[in-house]
């Protein structure tokens, strides 16, 4: 069963997909959004869900280091609810603390990617880390 992983920001949503067995995650794309204008990229997300035949969605939950939740965590929860309502898919959350830092470090240290190119792919890679961490901890989404 394929799952999507989402890294929800205020301007972009990074998207990753699992393999059919639910073992590995791979980055797909970055969807541009505009929270102020209530444009959440759901049409494009729906196309990806259909194309990849996703059966569930894992949304990164940006917790603070003390495990509390701030405004971005609330925005991620609201986005997950919109996805669940619009596409009738189960959603779950994965702590995304340090995934962007991890993605940035990988791009700099291992791939030697320029700053400009990093900005173009960082959210997609963060979504990949979110989904992979979820798969490693929980296996396929079954709720």
UniProtKB/Swiss-Prot annotation:
GO terms for cellular component: cytosol. It is found in: Cytoplasm. One of its GO terms (biological process) is rRNA 5'-end processing. Its main location: cytoplasm. It comes from the Bacteria. Could be a nuclease involved in processing of the 5'-end of pre-16S rRNA. This is Putative pre-16S rRNA nuclease. The lineage of its organism: Bacteria, Bacillati, Bacillota, Bacilli, Lactobacillales.
């Amino acid at each position: 069963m394929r799952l999507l992983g989402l890294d929800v920001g205020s301007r972009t949503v990074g998207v990753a997909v699992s393999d059919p067995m639910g073992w590995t995650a791979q980055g797909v794309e970055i969807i541009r959004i505009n929270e102020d204008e209530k444009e959440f990229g759901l049409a494009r997300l729906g196309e990806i869900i259909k194309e990849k035949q996703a059966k569930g969605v894992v949304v990164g939950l940006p917790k603070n280091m003390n495990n509390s939740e701030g405004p971005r965590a609330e925005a991620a929860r609201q986005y997950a609810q919109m996805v669940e309502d619009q596409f009738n898919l189960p959603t779950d959350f994965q702590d995304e603390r340090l995934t962007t830092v991890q993605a940035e470090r990988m791009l700099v240290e291992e791939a030697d990617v320029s700053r400009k190119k990093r900005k173009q792919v960082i959210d997609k890679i963060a979504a990949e880390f979110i989904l992979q961490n979820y798969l490693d901890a929980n296996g396929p989404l079954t709720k």
